[in-house]
Amino acid sequence: MADSPWDEIREKFQTALALSRVELHKNPEKEPYKSKYSARALLEEVKALLGPAPEDEDERPQADDSLGAGEHALGLPAELVEAEGPVAQGAVRRAVIEFHLGVNHIDTEELSAGEEHLVKCLRLLRKYRLSHDCVSLYIQAQNNLGILWSEREEIETAQAYLESSEALYNQYMKEIGSPPLDPTEHFLPEEEKLPEQERSKRFEKVYTHNLYYLAQVYQHMEMFEKAAHYCHSTLKRQLEHNAYHPMEWAINAATLSQFYINKQCFMEARHCLSAANVIFGQIGKIRTTEDTTEAEGDVPELYHQRKGEIARCWIKYCLTLMQNAQLSMQDNIGELDLDKQSELRALRKKELDEEESVRKKAVQFGTGELCDAISAVEEKVSYLRPLDFEEARELFLTGQHYVFEAKEFFQIDGYVTDHIEVVQDHSALFKVLAFFETDMERRCKMHKRRIAMLEPLIVDLNPQYYLLVNRQIQFEIAHAYYDMMDLKVAIADKLRDPDSHIVKKINNLNKSALKYYQLFLDSLRDPNKVFPEHIGEDVLRPAMLAKFRVARLYGKIITADPKKELENLATSLEHYKFIVDYCEKHPEAAQEIEVELELSKEMVSLLPTKMERFRTKMALT
């Protein structure tokens, strides 16, 4: 039993905190918030025992307390007023209770009541917010209001609260700097107060949470550069203070890598992914940190899913780096330009010379052993654009390793879309590797591998439910056959007298490419099988490319039958004319296929003459 009212207050408060920490699944199934409601009742009792705060006789916040009116919400510099004396101490303790009541109501999904308590907490602390006793509590209350408004999708309001917290932290650290009181200490006897080191740890954790929430807000506002900066700061601080959930940390680092990949900052992307691998490897091996949930390591499915997701980020890294190199070295018909390759080789030395200075500016996670472990992963994967087949092959093999890892979880049974995307990435890795290969027969084999992995996908896919995916795969298979046919034609051109086997092979590849391009084009038809007069913007370019390639394919069919050849030329002309006519009616389409349109116009001009000569020749024979 408590010996005095103050002992009773402290006892009730500590019991309320303990009840607040009880996880929902430990409550009765029909009363998931039982412990929260019990904690709330005790907090209300403590509030009653403390009595009303001066100038706060249960009045509602005034109009000037709303966000944007009070300077507390704008992050303006605060004046230092210490919370000294019984009046100030009473207000602070009341604010602690209002804060916990606010969080309690939010936890039980009573957001308006939660907001009211948190705003009241801020109001009680406003003039003391820069003080050693109150700054941590004030920042935590603002952080919670930031989250609350973010969940309501009032992002600018959330931003104001969170930026105010950041400004207050920075002002406090600059002007005062000593570790402030943790809110729980207001109800602890002097001998149980926290040591400076623990206070510092808790305060830094509060600030880390602030940065984490700001990163999410900036992401939501599409301020991607700022979001990445805050995400990196959060991850770095979590490692420094050893306060992180390995699975969550690794996923956040892998997600951050995608920002750097899109910015073509491959060194930074590689560092994030390497750190993700190392930290993910800690699951089940390290001492549980304060932020780690009990579920850590206990959910095999989630573990394998996250592992697969990180693997997919690695695939994106390898694929984008290879594609970036291809774009830098290809000529206007998509083949390797040796002059561009030589120029990039000359630039490589400069890139390597600048590596150390770039590295100093780049994102860096961890120190000591952790840093060494991350570096060991980094050293196995290049961040430089590959300049030849051997360099491209190294990246390809890394990407393929992660394809197999991703497919372990993302299987066709249960994860149809994800599985297909992974297979498409695998195909894309082969496609870009083929660009670096100089041997045409080996290039053919790479495209053959692509077809072998893509064709089985559409056999089991219901086009009614997976129309877009079906179209993507049909187009990709068609293009792979198209590329193989071009390569076989190039090989045949080098032979003095191509045999019938090669001719048959070319025609079969041609036929397969036509089949899949036609399947793609047929998928654009309406229920009455009529091709649209106006092609949707999302499929305009692929539809025009398909028409162009179908036209070209008919012109490439090898036949000894003059009548058949004339029919093929007529079909080819029909498709070229479609492109020209469509672009005349829809000028916006011309911008999508400028090169193909010019070639189509040429063919529309040339083919009739060629066909007429052919008819004359046929008549003579």
Swiss-Prot record:
One of its GO terms (cellular component) is cytoskeleton. The gene is KIFBP. It is found in: Cytoplasm, Cytoskeleton. The modification Phosphoserine is found at S178. Keywords: Cytoplasm, Cytoskeleton, Developmental protein, Differentiation, Neurogenesis, Phosphoprotein. This is KIF-binding protein. Belongs to the KIF-binding protein family. Activator of KIF1B plus-end-directed microtubule motor activity. Required for organization of axonal microtubules, and axonal outgrowth and maintenance during peripheral and central nervous system development. SUPFAM superfamilies: TPR-like. GO terms for biological process: central nervous system projection neuron axonogenesis; in utero embryonic development; microtubule cytoskeleton organization; mitochondrion transport along microtubule; neuron projection maintenance. One of its GO terms (molecular function) is protein sequestering activity.
